[in-house]
Amino acid sequence: MLTSPSLSTLGAMTLSRVYGFKPQSIYKFIEEAGSIENLFRLDDNHRQSLKLGDDALEYSLKEWERMRALGAHFISIEDEAYPKLLRECEDAPIGLYYRSDSEPEEFFSHPMISIVGTRDISPYGRLWCQNIVHALAQTPTKPSIVSGLALGVDGVAHESALRESLPTIAVLPTGIESYSPRSHYQLSEKCAHTPDCALISDFSIGYPVTATNFLRRNRIIAGLSRATILIESKKHGGGLITARLASEYNRDVFVLPGRIDDIRSQGCNNLLEQELAEVIANLETLSSRLGLGRTYLSARGSFCERIENHYGNLPPEMLEDLLKVANCITEHRNDMMEEIAQRCSLTYSRVLSLCMMMQKDGLLQIDLLQRCHIIVKK
């Protein structure tokens, strides 16, 4: 007979695999039995009627062996290390698989902020996602950035956190051994092997990606954190669903404002219209509204200050033109080069030359419409 701790763990793994999409059923069974262990000490015939018989436990034991061979672990909701805010959710997962070089007591100990949004991230969204993470990194209370490891906003959020030396937790829509998307293999490995960071999932080993997985994943992203920040989202985007779930859990929701005619901002603007979210209007006050203390951003400086520091040895006349262009790009983010030239009273060829120089030096990105986007670096 399995020892009590092993029976509790294997029982939670079994419940997660069989009833992962029906958490209410899981908690009904546990409430009736008194605990996970008590549930799996019931008569096998009774448990067979619930699809939780000895054969299901034996399968979980094999899964546990595969899990450990992969360097992964599992904690149940009955474990002290299970994240407190997630435990408060009525549909909380019965357990979590994880891969990390740190213990759950460590990577779940930080205040958590979720950052989510569209896979089709714009240069504007990328810039401000990076800016927001940078601002959070300047707070006295260093939060952990939670997201879903998807393309777009998720990837930028994780990468920015790692660059800023913030912990980050990636919640997967698959088994813990999988990588989705595969292009984020290196990023996922960094999350697994950076101190205080982790990959987590409530899907059993080998569970494939299906469309229904994402809602189940999103409720973990929303439930882990004291607040969710939506960077960009289309009208029916997954990030919008996560933000709505966070609101239903009575957590704070913040959104990056966007143009009313921008398809990537429809979700954010809808939340604002419905008064389900607060607008991010000032990075220096955002962190205090998140309960993280005040942010001090002076060390980073403005884009113009970065230009002045980078090109300080240029002839004064050339530096003056550069600063004109940099200031115009900062204040008029969607202007094309012809419009920048008009605003700065410079020739188009002069602006093109200066912008190409800044792009070559990694300070700007010029798109196909000749709009200039500031590249944020630490």
Show the residue positions of the predicted features.
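Glycine-biased, small-residue-rich flexible motifs in mid-sequence functional cores and linkers
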Residues: L2-P5, S76-K378
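Short, small/acidic-rich helices and loops at N termini and domain boundaries
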Residues: M1-A81, D361-R371, V376-K378
